[in-house]
């Protein structure tokens, strides 16, 4: 019987150099997608997929991420006194959205090391990992698509998306065999292959469901590209020793860790809003005509 997945790890310790100078004072995960930060979108993806026990891997200067989901007594009292019930309900909803805890990554040593920092909090059970730079809109949600594959095969699963031709060297790329629909049994993973040497165009998409066996593998993984412990290197070892699956995610993906991708994400989410969508569309079309 496959053990159910109850926990999710959200690595949020990155400095956010691509968004300087704003990230000098504000964690990049709190940059708004209209009026909701990217981290909330990922937390809600977890919750809507049945994951309410969430572990954030933070670093120095990232306490605001935990504060965002914590009770804000003075703010709530103020909103109540002013009769702003809609805003009060919005704030209180954040308090009860999920059970969120934090562990520290004491130094920047890569994504693999960030996941390893959550080892004690996760314990000996399978868990999900969501990268905050990758935003997904899908039905079912992105991580739920992985959970369904994990429940069927009982092996680690990575989310996949098809990258444009010529951009394979920018991503972790997989080689695999289709086993039905959008699911693949993976043969190997390559972190940012040299141009022209990628085994496919299927890239790892910032969503993972992993068995606890990944932790000892991570602990023994030597620093790779950039002197960091790469999660992809550990996944390659897991793939060879225990097997690994991939699922091509159905839905829309935005790379909110890139300036252009971030702006596109804001625009897309704004266009879908019933309160501002029409005005944003009209304004954007006017700007395009004038540019």
Question: What residue ranges belong to the model's regions?
Answer:
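Positively charged, low-complexity intrinsically disordered leader regions
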Residues: 2-8, 278-285
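N-terminal glycine-rich phosphate-binding loop and ensuing alpha1 helix
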Residues: 2-84, 141-145
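Residues at the starts of beta-strands that form the adenosine-phosphate
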Residues: 7, 52-54, 99, 126, ...
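Alpha-helix/helix-capping structural signal
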Residues: 14, 60, 134, 141, ...
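Conserved beta-loop-beta/alpha segment of the NTase-like Rossmann-fold superfamily
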Residues: 75-80, 85-176, 212, 219-221
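Catalytic-core segments of class I nucleotidyltransferases/pyrophosphorylases
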Residues: 128, 147-151, 178-282
């Amino acid at each position: 019987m496959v053990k159910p997945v109850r926990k999710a790890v959200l690595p949020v310790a990155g400095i956010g150099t691509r968004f300087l100078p704003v990230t000098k004072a504000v964690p990049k995960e709190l940059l708004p997608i209209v009026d909701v930060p990217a981290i909330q979108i990922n937390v809600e993806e977890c919750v809507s997929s049945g994951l309410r026990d969430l572990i954030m891997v933070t670093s120095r200067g990232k306490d605001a991420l935990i504060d965002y989901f914590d009770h804000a007594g003075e703010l709530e009292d103020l909103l109540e006194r002013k009769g702003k019930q809609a805003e009060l309900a919005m704030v209180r909803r954040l308090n009860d959205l999920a059970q969120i805890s934090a562990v520290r990554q004491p130094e920047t040593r890569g994504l693999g090391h960030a996941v390893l920092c959550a080892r004690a909090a996760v314990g000996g059970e399978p868990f999900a990992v969501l990268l905050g730079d990758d935003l997904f809109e899908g039905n079912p949600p992105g991580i739920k698509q992985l959970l369904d594959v994990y429940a069927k095969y009982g092996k680690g699963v990575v989310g996949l998306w098809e990258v444009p031709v010529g951009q394979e060297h920018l991503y972790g790329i997989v080689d695999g065999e289709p086993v039905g629909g959008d699911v693949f049994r993976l043969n190997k993973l390559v972190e940012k292959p040299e141009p022209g040497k990628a085994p496919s165009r299927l890239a790892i998409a910032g969503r993972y469901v992993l068995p606890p066996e990944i932790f000892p593998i991570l602990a023994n993984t030597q620093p790779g590209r950039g002197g960091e412990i790469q999660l992809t290197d550990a996944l390659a070892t897991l793939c060879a020793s225990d097997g690994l699956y991939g699922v091509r995610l159905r839905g829309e993906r935005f790379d909110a860790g890139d300036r252009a991708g971030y702006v596109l994400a804001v625009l897309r989410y704004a266009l879908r809003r019933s309160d501002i969508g029409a005005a944003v569309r009209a304004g954007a079309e006017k700007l395009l005509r004038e540019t």
